[in-house]
């Protein structure tokens, strides 16, 4: 073999070796990507948009994780996290109270929406413009002790007699249809979904935010919770996951229509409701945070105020001051 041929063979051999090493490194890098289950609280909706954006835009991949967004099974999303079956889930501060009192190993690590956007909706023709106007009306209830205690405080805060509010079962996943059909007159909803839904369906309605009447009711709902053992053993990974989610919600704040389409892409059952989803997203994109850099952060005074109310009204026996939340991973 000529010298030039030997040189050529040497170069080719070296290049093949480099390619093989590079491929091996790529395989190793892919192997480092950790699969993580994230449990939703309900079917996909605009509370979840930032999660789908984070997945679509590759923010999770940049964090070294492959997050699988899963619908909740019959078992509560919080119970899956408590039992270590998933590290993260969506839940609610008000529902966390009883779990925390029983010693559940969960912590809220990010607030999806800065302020409580839930409240009471009614037909405009019924002229319910204050909580005291619920007196004599049919309220669709889930018969949850915390719900009814809050409603009592709400009505009485404006001088109404809670005992004169007629409570009827609300077993519908969509409260707008039974209100429109007169099954009950009022219901507790989240404006960002059911409130916008009412408008999209042409239901002329009044709406009252709970927080506008009782300051303690400006609690955090929904929130992202995590398993305490997972947080302890995987601090850096948890921080990267939450930071990726934060980027997803920040993107949704700045690009609501594109974010809505990303949600629809991942939840095709919403495709026929695109106009409604976009309106819902436009509303929530302004509610996620007043300052995008502070998305997800908890105000300790507001968190504690609700649990103090819980204790004063017999919902809780234990003092949960400063328990159940952290800003460590979201800042």
Language-model regions, residue ranges each:
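Bacterial signal peptide processing site
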Residues: 24-26
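Short, solvent-exposed loop/beta-turn-alpha elements that line the ligand-binding surface or hinge
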Residues: 62, 132, 210-217, 285-300
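Secondary-structure end/capping motifs
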Residues: 232-313
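Bacterial N-terminal signal peptides that target proteins for export
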Residues: 1-11
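C-terminal motif of bacterial Sec signal peptides marking the signal peptidase cleavage site
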Residues: 19-22
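Conserved C-terminal helix/tail region of periplasmic/extracytoplasmic solute-binding proteins
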Residues: 303-331
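Pocket-lining segment of extracytoplasmic ligand-binding domains
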Residues: 94-95, 174-267
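Short, glycine-/small- and polar/acidic-enriched structural segments
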Residues: 32-171, 181, 185-192, 208
């Amino acid at each position: 073999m000529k010298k030039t041929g030997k040189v050529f063979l040497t170069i080719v051999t070296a290049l093949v070796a480099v390619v093989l090493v590079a491929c091996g490194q790529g395989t190793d890098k892919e192997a480092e990507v950790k699969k993580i289950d994230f449990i939703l609280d309900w079917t996909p909706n605009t509370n979840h948009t930032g999660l789908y954006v984070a997945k679509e835009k590759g923010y999770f991949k940049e964090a070294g994780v492959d997050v699988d967004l899963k619908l909740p099974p019959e078992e509560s999303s919080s119970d899956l996290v408590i039992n270590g079956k998933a590290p993260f889930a969506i839940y609610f501060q008000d529902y966390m109270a009883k779990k925390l009192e029983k010693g559940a190993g969960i912590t809220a690590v990010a607030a999806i929406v800065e302020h409580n956007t839930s409240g009471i909706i009614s037909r405009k023709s019924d002229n319910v413009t204050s909580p005291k106007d619920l007196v004599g009306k049919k309220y669709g209830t889930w018969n949850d002790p915390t719900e009814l205690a809050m409603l009592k405080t709400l009505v009485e805060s404006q001088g109404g007699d809670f005992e004169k509010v007629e409570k009827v079962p609300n077993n519908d996943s969509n409260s707008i249809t039974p209100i429109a059909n007169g099954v009950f007159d009022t219901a507790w909803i989240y404006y960002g979904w059911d409130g916008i839904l009412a408008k999209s369906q042409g239901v002329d309605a009044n709406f009252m935010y709970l927080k506008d009447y009782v300051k303690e009711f400006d609690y955090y709902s929904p929130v992202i919770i995590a398993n305490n053992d997972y947080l302890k053993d995987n601090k850096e990974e948890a921080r990267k996951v939450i930071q990726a989610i934060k980027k997803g919600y920040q993107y949704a704040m700045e690009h609501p229509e594109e974010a809505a389409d990303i949600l629809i892409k991942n939840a095709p059952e919403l495709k026929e409701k695109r106009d409604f989803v976009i309106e819902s997203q436009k509303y929530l994109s302004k509610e996620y945070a007043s300052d995008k850099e502070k998305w997800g952060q908890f105000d300790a005074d507001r968190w504690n105020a609700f649990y103090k109310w819980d204790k004063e009204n017999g919902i809780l026996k234990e003092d949960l001051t400063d328990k159940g939340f952290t800003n460590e991973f979201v800042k």
